[in-house]
Amino acid sequence: MATPYYIPEERVPLPPKDAEVLSTACDYCVVACGYKVYRWPVAGGKEGGPKAEENAFGEDFPVSPLGPWIAPNQHNIVLHDGQPHHVVIIPDKDAKHVNVDGDSSIRGGAIAKKCYNPQTPTRDRLKTPLIRIYGVLMPVPWDFALDIAAEVSKHVIKAHGANAYGVKTYSYQYMENTYAITKYALRHINTANFTFHDTPSDVSSTPGFRDAGFDNFAPSYEDWRDAETLLICGTDPYETKTILFTQWIMKGIQNGQKAIFMVPRRTAGVAYAEKNGGLWLDVTPGTDLLLVNAIAREIVKNGWEDSDWIKKWVNNKWESSSGFGQGTRNTPWQWRTTWGLFQTKGFEDWKKWLMAQDEFKLENAAKLTGVSPEKIKTAAQWMAKPDKGKRPKTSIMIEKGFYWSNNTGNTQAISALGIVVGAGGRPGQVIARAGGHQRGGLRGGKYPRNKSPIKVPGRRRRALDTDAYLIAGHTRLAHVIGNTWIQSMCGSQGLAKRFDELVVANPHQVRSFDKQDIIDTLKRRADSGGMVVYNQDIYLVDPIGNRYADIIFPAATWGEETFTRANGERRVRVYQRFYDPPGAARPDWWIIAQLAKRMGFDGFDWKDSNAVLEEGARFSRGSRKDFFMVKVAAKREGKTLHQKLAEFGTDGIQGPVLMRADGTLEETKRLHDTARKLPDTGPSGANRFNKKLTHFNSQTGKCNIQKSPWSLFSDYWEWMRPKGDELWCTSGRINERWQSGFDDRRRPYIVQRWPENWVELHPDDAKARGIENGDYVMVYSERVPAMKDTILGVEPKDFSFSELMKNGHIELSKAAITAVAMVTPAIKPGVAYMDFLHTSQPANALAGRVVDWISGNYNYKMGVGKVRKIGESPYKDSFRSMSFAPRDIA
């Protein structure tokens, strides 16, 4: 049987001396390594030669292994100004920041293959607007598609209200786009039926960080390197943020850093840490809170807390309650920090609470978490025990495997642990997220929380749960932009079933080529209780586009427009356009602007992407990536904002950005920098001194230390806990694939390595089920819980999982996916691990569609199911595709 294979090119052209050189950054993970783009015409057959004076690198070829060589996956042919051009895209060897060694991950290293080229698998890029007529997506002109969309949109808003217009969009795909989208959805439509790609509600992903006063991306990458002890929770940076690990954390480990990983599987990063004296806390899914608080308990029991830091930087109750006035605490962080369930009177009160909880005692926590008491003690010692009177410099890094497991509880617990060990705004002593995607959000409107129908106990509104609202039949128009809504959400197969009912099964289907007939048909569908779907994307996504969308808008992406974005240390950079988008594809800001103008909205008359960014710049003020003063500098110099940002090349400029008295720009290495001195005279000109520059994000500028009750989550965990022959089914990233694999599925090299979905099983679990490497298995559940109502809470218990079950607000459904078994001792017994977003077989189908009722986020990593063999895959006995070799090696 044939399996996917890859035959690499044997020859790659060198750029000639006169090749154009542009700067960009990788389009994938949060690190955003800097890249150089070399571009020259195909016409004439011109290429660089092997001698230094003959090529753009100024190097004699062959070069040393670390020199600027070009791999086959770093070359492509694109159209520029309508003519074929070579492009070579390689890491910037001269970068002074981020990828300082000029290296790349396997993902970024092949980014040239992302570019549209009809001779490659990218040939299926969307090139023209499409409308579904007689069940078939048919090409139509822009005006035709936009006119129809605008008329239907206006009707839905007028007839059913703004909340009937749902917008599900990315939060990161460049500031020019996110500003336009949020201006349209939040400022003009003013819908509360709005959220981003990775959550059902527009809420903070890390509520505990927000409550404590920590910014998600406060540190510089130097801080991760310079920590003496680094606790990494819920991620392996090597697998997910490779350059952050290899060029920063790894160097710290080589210099003696003690790295502690809190994850249920032993990956390459964990193996490297252990080999170099590190520690693996092999936590059972969902029990992170118990483990974190057990470590904290050991620290305070022994008096190892950073008492000087705590005395100076931790609020007492009067301070945490101060500054709110006499109104209600409707803002989520306000009511959480003043609610007795979380709020404390300060450190001593928190300590008293912590020591009184039986579940945090060493032996009890060890039993549920599966982490030995010895490991818990070791972690506490490394993080906090002074050595000859000197405290260790400890930092804490968290990511999705941690905060998507018990969202509010875990982030409250880890924030308190960070405070206890003095992880704040000091070199090598920080606490933050590692990051997933890059930071391209720029808000053009404020979320209208007062329009959300979801009320939690007290006079408190929570952002609308877009999944539950849709399932209840209230969403009459779903506008989906650049994400895989359905597979990316929990209980995804149940969500797909509801899309089928509202869209496909509705009798009002377009069966006419007449514009007015199409408009009238889609209006009737919305009025009948059905749903209309618009989709903007670069590829036809299944099923949101391929099966459900009535109108498809083709988008231009990385390299096809000049865009701006920040990375995980707040470094703002311009991503220069270097080739033409396919067909009639246009950037999302343009699509939104055309739709908005047809709907009668003002303020969308932008001539280019720079105009969008210049308008949006003032909305960056006060944010972690504040770049408004760069715009001020640009105007003083007679330049556009894009031109000014381009001057910083691949290094970019680290926000928030200030302007000195002499007009030069000042960057921010880290937020919460307690040693930073700002002018006593205060900000001058258009400068704004964000509190987070030198203090924490609370009313007083100090940290809030809060309780993290296990009881808020324990009933859900106990119910989900595997029964009989079930396993925990959790998920995450794999090094070679990014997000949904939208680019990776079009790279033969990656498809050969990962041709299908896979599931890791421990040898003991596999043996008990008669499963071997390469077997096809079914992973299934007969009890996937899902919230079926939007309810108004009166008492706190109304939203507890056990109470929701008792009162009939939870329905159970079945789900199943298939995968290729990978048997490995790297995964903890009792746990199965899968790709988090393999679109054809989504792991999220097995995760409960029940939000954390306090934050509104899903606990994506909390799936459960059974596994059984259904046959043998062609990869079981073939060594050409899908290796089963161990990955936890160092």
Across the structure, where does each feature detected by a protein language model lie?
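Glycine/threonine-rich phosphate-binding loop and adjacent beta-strand/alpha-helix elements that clamp
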Residues: G559-P581, I591-A596, V823
